[in-house]
Amino acid sequence: MAKSRFEYVRQFEVHDALLPDTYIVVRVDGKKFHEFSKYYNFAKPNDERALKLMNAAAKNVFMQYKQEMICAYGESDEYSFILKRDTKLFNRRRDKISTLFVSLFTANYVSLWNLFFPDVVLHHKHLPYFDSRCVCYPNLTVVKDYLSWRFVDTHINNLYNTVFWYLIIKCGLTPQESEQKLCGTLSSDKQEILFSECGINYNNEPEMYKKGSLVNSKGEIVHIDVVKQIDEIFNGF
């Protein structure tokens, strides 16, 4: 940068470095995706195209910085990227890492859109956008619990949404009636309602819907029980 009398303004910049010797998780999350998915008429309760687009965008981000990564996990409109404890990426600057991941993810989402929605044109007034945050976790136990939390959240949300929407689509309930029917129900109750009233066995739903998507250390997209295979996922890290 050229020297000038105005250069003093750089003194006001803050370079917030993330804590050293900690695992960094960057979570990218869709903003106003309820409106976005409604405008583009995403299928309910799950849109396979949309989920595969998220996976493709996440994999490209992962592969771009594979040497810094352990894995990435996504469901719905969010993705978590778990960086190695000793990463020196951008000198661990919070703003650099956060903005890089969210901009790279968004760019890939938009550029890959036509591969998954070939007959749907993105409208300039209805573009996808995401936010991101960086969180430091002190040890592997906490990181494993973080990933397990996201996995369990996926199961809870997907089971509810699956039953909620099929009661509307297949049984003709209104959204209010469906919500009321599910109020106070346990997981087993929801599965029974889905089977007895909608004729759908939740166990036969696609693994991607039930378990989310993991980009493993090899860059492969898999749909596994994260809680049961948590030690295997982090083996060597």
From Swiss-Prot:
Residues that bind Mg(2+) 1: D29, G30, D77
The record's free-text note on cofactor binding: Binds 2 magnesium ions per subunit.
Reaction catalysed by this enzyme: a 5'-end ribonucleotide-tRNA(His) + GTP + ATP + H2O = a 5'-end phospho-guanosine-ribonucleotide-tRNA(His) + AMP + 2 diphosphate + H(+)
Chain residues that bind Mg(2+) 2: D29, D77
Keyword annotations of the record: GTP-binding, Magnesium, Metal-binding, Nucleotide-binding, Nucleotidyltransferase, Transferase, tRNA processing
Alphabetical GO biological process terms: tRNA modification; tRNA processing
InterPro entries cross-referenced by the UniProt entry: Thg1_C_dom, tRNAHis_GuaTrfase_cat, tRNAHis_GuaTrfase_Thg1, tRNAHis_GuaTrfase_Thg1_sf
Listed EC numbers: 2.7.7.79
Functional description taken from the UniProt entry: Adds a GMP to the 5'-end of tRNA(His) after transcription and RNase P cleavage.
Family, per entry: Belongs to the tRNA(His) guanylyltransferase family.
Protein name stated in the entry: tRNA(His) guanylyltransferase
Species assigned in the record: Kluyveromyces lactis (strain ATCC 8585 / CBS 2359 / DSM 70799 / NBRC 1267 / NRRL Y-1140 / WM37) (Yeast)
